[in-house]
């Protein structure tokens, strides 16, 4: 079996237009000590055929296509398939800076006691793609690190996890629809060794087809209250939706102002927007390389 330092894991379903853009770039930039793991949820839009060809050509290392019970089920399968020492979740419609991800992975490889690395985050929406905002959970991390709170939340779009740490922090809870929110609370409540990177390894892209744009608000609220009690979560600004700042940004981008159909549509040809996203995240990290806060 090959030895991999870093596994990029993807769970997807019927998102070929986004997935093809993301995978094309990842495949182009992949290093020899890295693998790509893809779990498809039995897509019907051509995704299966596309991934099957990539797998036959040896461009992705592991691939299955079968129905998932829910979103977290698909991601759990992908994480369990990973063979790398470090696991990085790649969401099919978001943007990632792979050189910065490797910087985070190298830090974890050099510091075996670290379970998880999280970072600052960039946010944008397809309907106004040149407007990019920054978000951070650093103040919440500091509160937790200094034991002023038992748990805090963060999005999983920028998270790196040590594979061997899964036996301690667990996988996604398949009951929770706000799976990254619960996962973050659990990791911090368990006092996992979390390190904060002050750069940006990911850019979250909001659009009308994004999974997080269509959550059941009532169920999210009910499960949020449940998780709050489970993990003694004091709450902060993320409580607005009991999700993460990423979802708050999406909601504002999609439904603010006139709330018309024109505000939520985007071109099916997303190449221009994503080219801009990749350019900007690289520029931002070159201007501010970031550092690690232990």
Question: Model segments located where?
Answer:
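Conserved donor NDP-sugar-binding/catalytic core segment of glycosyltransferases
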Residues: 99-132
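Cell-envelope/extracellular polymer assembly enzymes that use nucleotide-activated donors
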Residues: 4-7, 35, 182
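Short, acidic, metal-binding catalytic loop of nucleotide-sugar glycosyltransferases
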Residues: 24-33
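Short beta-strand/loop segment that forms part of the nucleotide-sugar
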Residues: 33-42, 64-67
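Conserved nucleotide-sugar donor-binding catalytic segment
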Residues: 141-219, 223
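A conserved acidic beta->alpha catalytic loop
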Residues: 40-49, 91
């Amino acid at each position: 079996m090959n030895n991999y330092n870093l596994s990029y894991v993807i769970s997807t379903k019927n998102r070929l237009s986004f997935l093809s853009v993301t995978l094309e770039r990842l495949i182009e930039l992949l290093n020899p000590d890295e693998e790509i793991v893809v779990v498809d949820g039995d897509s019907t839009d051509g995704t299966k055929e596309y991934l099957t060809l990539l797998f036959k050509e040896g461009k992705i290392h592991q691939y299955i296509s079968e129905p998932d019970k829910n979103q977290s089920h698909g991601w759990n399968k992908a994480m369990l398939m990973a063979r790398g020492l470090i696991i990085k979740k790649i969401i099919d419609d978001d943007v990632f800076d792979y050189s910065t991800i490797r910087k985070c992975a190298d830090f974890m490889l050099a510091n075996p006691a670290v379970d998880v690395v999280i970072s600052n985050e960039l946010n944008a929406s397809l309907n106004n793609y040149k407007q990019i905002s920054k978000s951070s959970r650093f103040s919440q991390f500091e509160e937790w690190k200094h034991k002023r709170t038992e748990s805090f939340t963060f999005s999983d779009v920028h998270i790196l996890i040590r594979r061997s740490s899964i036996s301690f922090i667990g996988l996604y809870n398949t009951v929770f629809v706000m799976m990254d929110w619960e996962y973050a609370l659990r990791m911090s409540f368990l006092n996992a060794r979390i390190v904060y990177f002050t750069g940006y390894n990911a850019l979250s892209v909001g659009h009308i087809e994004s999974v997080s744009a269509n959550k059941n608000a009532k169920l999210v609220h009910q499960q949020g209250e449940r998780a709050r009690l489970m993990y003694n979560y004091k709450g902060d600004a993320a409580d607005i939706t009991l999700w993460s700042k990423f979802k708050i940004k999406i909601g504002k981008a999609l439904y603010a102002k006139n709330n018309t159909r024109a505000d939520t549509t985007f071109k099916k040809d997303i190449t221009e927007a994503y080219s801009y996203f990749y350019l900007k995240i690289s520029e931002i990290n070159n201007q501010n390389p970031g550092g690690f806060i232990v």
